[in-house]
Structures are given as C-alpha cells and as structure tokens.
Swiss-Prot record:
Changing A179E: Strong decrease in GTPase activity. GO terms for cellular component: cell division site; cytoplasm; plasma membrane. Keywords: Cell cycle, Cell division, Cytoplasm, GTP-binding, Nucleotide-binding, Septation. Changing K138A: Decrease in GTPase activity. Changing N22A: Strong decrease in GTPase activity. GO terms for biological process: cell division; division septum assembly; FtsZ-dependent cytokinesis; positive regulation of cell cycle; protein polymerization; septin ring assembly. The keyword Plastid does not apply. It comes from the Bacteria. Belongs to the FtsZ family. This is Cell division protein FtsZ. Residues 363-379 are annotated as: Interaction with sepF.
Length: 379
C-alpha cells in the first residue's frame, strides 16, 4: 500500500541580509502560518537573534561572520560560495519568497543568487524588497537600483516597496515608528495575502496553479492592501488597496490581477461582488483576473483586500486613482475597445521631505551591514 501524498503547496520565505532576516522575524511574530522560514546572513551575531526555522550563515571565510560591510559584491560572493547549501534548503519548495532590504551588502548582492537557485529548482519565485529613502544617500540608492535590476532578472515576479512613499502616508508630524510600521504591514500582508489564498480554505477557493498562472514569469508587480470596517467595508477596502501610496508606477498594461478578500464568516456575497467589480472595472479588458476569499473569524467585522497586478509595462504614464462610490468620486467610465479602463496607481515623483522623528535619532551610513535593515525594521 502506497503512503498518502501531501498535496499541499510547499511555501518557503527566505530573508537574506539584515533587512530580510528582520522581516522574517516580524512575520513570525505576527503569526504568518503555512510557510517555512529561512534566514540567511553574513552577520553571524545577528543571525543568532533570528526566530526562523532554518538559519544559514554564509561567507564564513570571506567575512568571518562579521557582515558584508554594505558591499553587494561581498554579499553576492558569500551567497555564491554557499550555493549547494542554499539549494538543499530550497529543494522541494513549490513557491519561494525572497525578501531583503535593497541598498546594503548581503541582501542586495545575495538575493539574486537565492532567487536564481529557487527558480532553477522549479519553484515559483517572488521577490519582495524595499527601496531605501532618498536621504540615505546616492551610493546606497545606486546599489539598490542595481540590486533590484539583478533580482528582477532572477525572479518570476518582483514586488518593490519604495520607502520614499512612506512620506505620503501621513501628515508632516507622522512619527518615524508609525511610518515604518505601515511599511512593515505592507510587507507582511503582501506575503500573507498570497499565501493565505493557497493555504486557507475560503468560499471561493484559489489554488496554487491559479497563483502560478498570474505570477509565473510576470516581471514587476504592483501590490496594494486595504482594510475597512462598518458599512461599505469591502468597497472601502478595495479602494484603499488599489490606491495605496506604497505602490509605484502605473497599472497600465497589466495582464494579470490576483485579488484576495478576507473577512469573517459574515462576509456577504453582495459585498464580495462590490469589491471584485471595482477591481474588474479598473483592469484591462483582456486581463486574467483571479480572485478568492479567505474566511478568518479573528478579523471580526474587518474586511481585508489584497490586490496584486502583474505582467505590465512600468514605463507607461501615470493615472489618477480609482475611487468607488464611497469615496465620493465618479465611477470609472467605459473605455473604448482595446483601451485600458484603469486609472490606478498614480505615480508620485520622489521628493526630499523633512522627516519628523519625535526626538528619535536615526543613524544612516557607515560600513556596518546593519544598514541593510530596512528603515521600517529599525527599532
């Protein structure tokens, strides 16, 4: 008699570098379920503090466990030297998330190596990374752009969270920690919004093949997350998701949209239809739109909507945000045949804005690879 097979998708989340390892720690703290966590770093001391299921210190010979010194080449070589070990850790995965803070050493240089290995093994590979603030300096910004370009070539789908957009999320007096916490929630909920669709049963189920159909070889992706309570909650949550200030570039040309609606057992068919219709109205007429629901009674009366748009040209012009009826704006009018009906994701040029830290001191720079920790992870 043959033993029963496990037909559940195997999902692994890899945090590499100071930022990636801290991101994994935060996901574990928040109770992200159904995935295996792997932490990879050149800083052996920082790795000891990780709560990940599996820890791998790389670059033992070249860095002696002291970090990459904010040098991506050191990070790349450290990951290359540990290729066999990384491959063994990723073997058997159906989907691999690679998360890092771009601009430093280990994450910037090592993330493309990890992603390449995962993809070679046949796993659906998704990168989720942060772009540093403009005020962190030109060198770090240039390193981040090079790292993002390399990671884009190595992943099926790459989601970039631009930290400069945090400055648009509140008034001028927003605290440093509140701004970082907002980005933290985007990173966590972005991964969770995808994994929950696969691992959590819902009224409308989405399986791994559906997710793979949207994200395989999709290139750059946009991600939006929204939540709301009370009357019109689903529509409000969808509006927030598709107009998130943490999204960069325009949705024009998107060929695939993945949408998740999470709520309690009282989640109604009418409100699901409202939220899905808003996204459908905003998408390309020929786009492949897949949506599913996740029933989670711990949410109470809250509804969460996650929208991921993939397979589009980020060079297209920006559009004004879509607003539903709850936002007081006009509904989207039908476009001519062959034209986009989307007015999503208006890009905003990065600007230098004074950051009010409420008395906190923020240190930027230096050779310590701790700078690889995304700002929203710094305590």
């Amino acid at each position: 008699m043959t033993p029963p097979h496990n037909y559940l998708a195997v999902i692994k989340v890899v945090g590499i570098g100071g930022g990636g390892v801290n991101a994994v720690n935060r996901m574990i703290e928040q109770g992200l379920k159904g995935v295996e966590f792997i932490a990879i770093n050149t800083d052996a001391q920082a790795l000891l503090m990780s709560d990940a299921d599996v820890k791998l210190d790389v670059g033992r010979d070249s860095t002696r466990g002291l970090g990459a010194g904010a040098d991506p080449e050191v990070g790349r070589k450290a990951a290359e030297d540990a290729k066999d070990e990384i491959e063994e850790l990723l073997r058997g995965a159906d989907m691999v998330f690679v998360t890092a803070g771009e601009g430093g050493g280990t994450g910037t240089g090592g993330a493309p190596v990890v992603a390449s290995i995962a993809r070679k093994l046949g796993a659906l590979t998704v990168g989720v990374v942060t772009r540093p603030f403009s005020f962190e300096g030109k060198r770090r910004s240039n390193q981040a752009e090079n790292g993002i370009a390399a990671l884009r070539e190595s992943c099926d789908t790459l989601i970039v969270i631009p930290n400069d957009r945090l400055l648009q999320m509140g008034d001028a007096a927003v605290s440093l920690m509140d701004a970082f916490r907002s980005a933290d929630e985007v990173l966590l909920n972005g991964v969770q919004g995808i994994t929950d669709l696969i691992t959590t049963p819902g009224l409308i189920n989405v399986d791994f093949a559906d997710v793979k159909g949207i994200m395989s070889g999709a290139g750059t992706a946009l991600m939006g997350i929204g939540s709301a309570r009370g009357e019109g909650r689903s529509l409000k949550a969808a509006e927030i998701a598709i107009n998130s200030p943490l999204l960069e570039a325009s949705m024009e040309g998107a060929q695939g949209v993945l949408m998740s609606i999470a709520g309690g057992s009282d989640l109604g068919l009418f409100e699901i239809n409202e939220a899905a219709s808003l996204v459908q109205d905003a998408a390309h007429p020929d786009a492949n739109i897949i949506f599913g629901t996740v029933i989670d009674d711990s949410l109470g009366d809250e509804v969460r909507v996650t929208v991921i748009a993939a397979g589009f040209d980020v060079s297209g012009p920006g559009r004004k945000p879509v607003m539903g009826e709850t936002g007081g704006a006009h509904r989207i009018e039908s476009a001519k045949a062959g034209k986009l009906t989307s007015t999503l994701f208006e890009p905003v040029d990065a600007v230098s804005v004074p950051l009010h830290t409420n008395g906190a001191t923020l240190s930027i720079g230096g050779d310590d690879d701790d700078v690889d920790v995304p700002p929203f992870m710094r305590r």
